[in-house]
Structures are given as C-alpha cells and as structure tokens.
C-alpha cells in the first residue's frame, strides 16, 4: 500500500446540530453546514494527498439516504485520499451506492503503522475499548464516538488509571473536533506526539478527586464478588435500592458518595 495512513473520526457531515445553526453540541464554532464543510474540505486537503489512505473511525455522514446521495458523493469526492470507513453508530446507509464511495466499510480493523521508526499494531474502532487486542504488547488503539463530552473525560481518566494499575493501554480519541486534530486527518506519529498536549487534555485530565477511588472500589468489589453484576456491585457499595433507580439517579447517588468535587459535578 503506497501513501501514508491517516486517522480521523466523527466528521458528522450534513449534521446541522454540530453547528450554531442547530444545537452546537460539539461547540465546533461553525455558523452553519456550508461553513463547516468548507473548512473541513480545506483543512483535509491541506493535510492529505491522493496517495494517502484515510481511516475514518465512524460517523462520517448524517442521514445517508437516497435523497442525499449525490450531495454526499460530491462532498466525499472533494476530499483527497483513499477513504476507509470504520462503521459508527450513525453510519446507516440506506443504499449500497454509498459503499462505492469508500475503499472498504467494516466495523473494526487492525493495521500496522510506523511509530518512532518501529512497526506498531493499530486497533481501529469507533468505540473506546480499554482491553483491546495486544494492549499488553504495545498495540495502540484509536477511536471516536465520545466527541469532547463528559464521557470522553471519563475515558481519559480510566485509561490513565488502568496504566497506573498495571494494565498498559495506549488509547487516543481522534474525533475531528478535538483541538489537536482540528478537522484534518493525522498520522499516528502526530497523534501520539500531540495528544497529551492538546487543550482538551490539559483542561479535562486534572486529578480526578475521587474518581479513581470509586473505580478502584468497584474493581475490588468485583474481585471479591465475581458472581455479581454492576447493579449488584453498586448495591453492595452504596446501599440497597440502586437496582430500582434510573441510571441518572444511580449516578447521582454515586457522586454523592464520592464528594462535592468540581469534576464530579460535570457527570452529575
């Protein structure tokens, strides 16, 4: 395979709710879809040649139906490179014509890429997976899905905690909206070199003030009660009644036991 391998996720082309014209839930700052598509096309093509292979880790198009096919075909053909799609939860193609716009469309893939001059196994998935294939042997995992949300914060914290606990994992969120990705596909070397220095990371990855203690308590309880599920674990740690609560109420109760911390408030 000639050309470089590059990676990006969660473009959400055609999705007005990631712009200010909709709900702006990603805080991308674009006033509308036209502006977003123009900026993404410019930054993408400045970073990608037609010899490159771009792995899009899910959620590339919004409402990819027959009505929107020619519009999306034009958008994708305007982006340089050979495009490989790892399926996300929003990649629901109503017609097989969309499959012709990509080199492949698959739910999961493993590739080999260069990092610091050495070959590395790279796990590609839309979803975060802490115990991915070959994580003990130095493999790297790239994913999307959680955007720059509270869920993404928790993934970072969990990854850091697992490494401290002796479960090695190198996991990177390559969502296009993150400041270090900035809407352009990036090489593995660039991702690893810039991820910890991104504005998102320095803002979100402070000491968790109780999060690690909570997770450690859950892990310890599971070790001593392997026959019990997650809800039963919460019952054992926090008292009876969790199983009858909604997920949100259960989380609020968990938070109340951790303490009144700024990072916890984001979840609760």
Question: What are these model-derived regions, one by one?
Answer:
Residues 234-238:
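Amphipathic alpha-helical interaction modules
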Residues 242-260, 264-266:
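Short, charged early-sequence alpha-helical segments and their helix-coil boundaries
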Residues 1-2, 49-50, 79-80, 118, ...:
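Residue-level preference for short coil/turn positions at secondary-structure junctions
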Residues 214-223:
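N-terminal acidic leader/helix
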């Amino acid at each position: 395979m000639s050309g470089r391998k590059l990676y990006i996720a969660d473009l959400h082309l055609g999705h007005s709710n990631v712009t200010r014209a909709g709900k702006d839930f990603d805080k991308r700052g674009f006033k509308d879809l036209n502006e977003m598509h123009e900026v993404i096309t410019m930054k993408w093509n400045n970073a990608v040649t037609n010899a490159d292979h771009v792995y899009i880790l899910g959620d590339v198009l919004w409402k990819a139906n027959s009505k929107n096919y020619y519009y999306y075909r034009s958008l994708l053909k305007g982006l340089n490179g050979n495009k490989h799609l790892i399926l996300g939860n929003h990649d629901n193609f109503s017609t097989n014509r969309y499959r012709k716009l990509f080199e492949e469309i698959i739910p999961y893939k493993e590739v080999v890429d260069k990092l610091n001059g050495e070959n590395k196994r790279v796990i590609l998935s839309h979803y975060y997976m802490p115990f991915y294939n070959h994580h003990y042997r130095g493999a790297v995992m790239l994913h999307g899905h959680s955007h720059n949300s509270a869920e993404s914060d928790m993934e970072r914290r969990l990854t850091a905690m697992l490494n401290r606990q002796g479960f090695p994992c190198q996991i990177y969120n390559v969502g296009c909206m993150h400041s270090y990705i900035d809407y352009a596909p990036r090489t593995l070397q660039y991702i690893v070199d810039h991820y910890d220095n991104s504005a998102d990371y320095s803002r979100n990855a402070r000491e968790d003030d109780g999060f690690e203690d909570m997770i450690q308590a859950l892990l310890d309880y599971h070790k001593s009660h392997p026959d019990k599920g997650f809800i039963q674990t919460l019952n054992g740690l926090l008292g009876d009644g969790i199983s009858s609560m909604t997920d949100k109420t259960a989380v609020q109760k968990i938070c109340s036991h951790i303490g009144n911390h700024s990072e916890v408030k984001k979840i609760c």
